[in-house]
Amino acid sequence: MKIKLAHLIMLLGLAMLPLSCRFSGFTTMGNPGPKLSKATVFAPDFLKALYKTELTLYGRTITGIIVIKKVANGYQMAMVSEVGLKYFEFFFPEGSPFNAQAKYVMAVLDREPLKEALINCFGLLFREANYNSQTRLKINESETKVLLIDREKGSRFSYYYHPISGEVGQLIQNRFFGTRTSIKLSNYKNDAPGSILVYRGKISMNLQRL
């Protein structure tokens, strides 16, 4: 029993190592003040963007165009093939993007675990970071990158972003009992990122703005 307990303690210690190292180079911010911008993926004046897309699902790859459009109460997203065949269409309500509505999903993709994974990946793009008493804010030594950490419904969210522009460079969702989602964003063009790379288990996406 003692051997098993010692082994368990060792495993827990190893599991905590990535957590302690992940934030190396960042120190806790004091009073951020009004100059600190909020983490932003799609700017408030964003209206519409098209992305050339390569989507790999459990070893199978589909390609096409993803259209993201800002509507009255959220965001509309659809993916179509190069010949106009629709793969899926989702509506992500503002304020609760993980409660997205599947407007259409092609039969071959219409599987609950897959739909849930797609909604989670895309929903993370539209989620607004929380700024409250539970939020942790850190900044790197050169003061060029802020790390915001908040928690919601069994998940921890990490936003790495520029303190002045608010442009998010990386988004991470760690679910306490689930799959980790990581999104890298770059090449911002005024109102939205030019490049979006998504990694979630056996699902990956490469979106390049047109």
What are these regions (language model features)?
Residues N140-L210:
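Gly/Pro-enriched, hydrophobic low-complexity segments
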Residues R22-S24:
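Bacterial signal peptide processing site
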Residues L17-S20:
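C-terminal motif of bacterial Sec signal peptides marking the signal peptidase cleavage site
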Residues S81-F88, Y104:
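Membrane-embedded segments
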Residues F98-N130:
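Acidic/charged, solvent-exposed loop-and-adjacent secondary-structure segments enriched in E/D, K/R, S/T
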Residues M1-I9:
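Bacterial N-terminal signal peptides that target proteins for export
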Residues F42-Q76:
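Post-signal-peptide N-terminal segment of Sec-exported extracytoplasmic proteins
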Residues G30-K52, E143:
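Post-signal peptide N-terminal segment of mature Sec-exported envelope proteins
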